[in-house]
Amino acid sequence: MLAGATAHAAELKAVDAPPPSALELSDISGRVHRLSDYRGRVVLVNFWATWCEPCREEMPSLDRLQKQLGTRSFVVLAVNVDEPEARIAKFLSAMPLDFPVLLDAGSKLTRAWKVRVLPASFVISPDGRARYTVTGELDWSAPAVVERIAKLLPGQ
């Protein structure tokens, strides 16, 4: 069972490791996304659920980060943890997002990546290695956070 993070100040924790396991999930429209499809880009993998208040609170900042850094060298992949598509669609109609929302029915990927608390995020560098992890809500559009992620972008 997953828990929602409490309102503590989350921060980017530096790591240098391969991603916990391969990512291959469909989005809400049925398109399959693989982490390998985004090789050469910075990928922010965010595990979330509509029932998780900190997850809902950080979504606008994830959307701002996606818009600020663009899509050619950066992408957010929001992995919804085991919720019905209708609930996710209702959430997205109220809060449209500028990045793919992937479906982890049965929480297989969530377990493989050892996610225990939501939201949980992993920042993957263009070479495919995990460079940062975050457990809990983070303001992804804060200047210090944007600066650290921007340093990972190709050509930086």
What are these regions (language model features)?
Residues 36-53:
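Short active-site neighborhood of thiol/selenol oxidoreductases, capturing the structured segment around
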Residues 56-95, 105-112:
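Structural microenvironment flanking redox-active thiols in thiol-disulfide oxidoreductases
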Residues 90-98, 104-151:
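Thiol/disulfide oxidoreductase modules built on the thioredoxin-like
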Residues 41-43, 73-75, 100:
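Structural signature of beta-strand start/N-cap positions in the alpha/beta core
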Residues 4-6:
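N-terminal signal peptide c-region/cleavage motif recognized by signal peptidases
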Residues 20-21, 43, 118-120:
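Short loop/turn microsegments at loop-to-beta-strand junctions
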Residues 44-46, 76-78, 122-123:
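Hydrophobic beta-strand core positions in alpha/beta domains
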Residues 8-35:
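N-terminal "domain-start" segment that seeds a small globular fold
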